[in-house]
């Protein structure tokens, strides 16, 4: 929880009141929300479940995009990144199956500090695959 502690410290230091963190399965929370309340949702390096038999456990899929669409305000943003190429392809396929998001060509999240997972991925020669989406309907 060291990473969460650092984020909480930064939130406190900067006196931010409009940020909420979830350390569990966000899908359980989103399923309970019945209105569009979020301006943006960031999902940075979700578990890639690299083994083929575990791919069904991956968070980002068409169903999750539908759930997230429900809780985003109109023109709200969804940012997803992964460092696993085959997960990126799967995410891209899920996005292409939906017409509820506009894919933004340039990311407004390029300023984000890299996480330890992202830094390690780059050091190991893996690429970061960002997806920046805007709710359009």
Q: Can you say where each PLM-predicted feature lies in the sequence?
A:
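Short alpha-helix immediately C-terminal to the canonical SAM-binding loop
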Residues: 1-6, 88
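S-adenosyl-L-methionine
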Residues: 5-40
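Aromatic-rich, lipid-facing transmembrane alpha helices and their immediate juxtamembrane interface loops
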Residues: 9-10, 71-74, 126-127, 132
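Short, well-ordered coil/turn elements that cap or connect secondary structure elements
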Residues: 16, 73, 96-98
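A short SAM/SAH-binding and catalytic strip from SAM-dependent methyltransferases
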Residues: 38-59
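Conserved class I S-adenosyl-L-methionine
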Residues: 53-54, 77-98
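A short glycine-rich, Lys/Arg-flanked "PGG" loop and its adjoining helix->strand segment in the class I
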Residues: 58-77
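Class I S-adenosyl-L-methionine
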Residues: 88-137
């Amino acid at each position: 929880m060291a990473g969460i502690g650092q984020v909480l410290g930064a939130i406190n230091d900067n006196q931010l009141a409009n940020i909420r963190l979830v350390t569990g399965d966000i899908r359980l929370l989103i399923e309970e929300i019945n209105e569009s309340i979020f301006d943006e949702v960031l999902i940075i390096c979700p578990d890639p479940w690299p083994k083929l038999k575990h791919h069904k456990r991956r968070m980002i899929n068409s169903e999750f995009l539908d759930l997230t669409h429900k809780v985003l305000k109109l023109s709200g943003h969804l940012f997803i990144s992964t460092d696993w190429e085959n997960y990126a392809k799967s995410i891209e396929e899920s996005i292409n199956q939906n017409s509820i998001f506009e894919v933004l060509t340039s990311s407004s999240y390029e300023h984000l500090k890299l996480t330890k997972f992202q830094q390690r991925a780059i050091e190991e020669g893996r690429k970061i695959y960002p997806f920046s989406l805007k709710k359009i309907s």
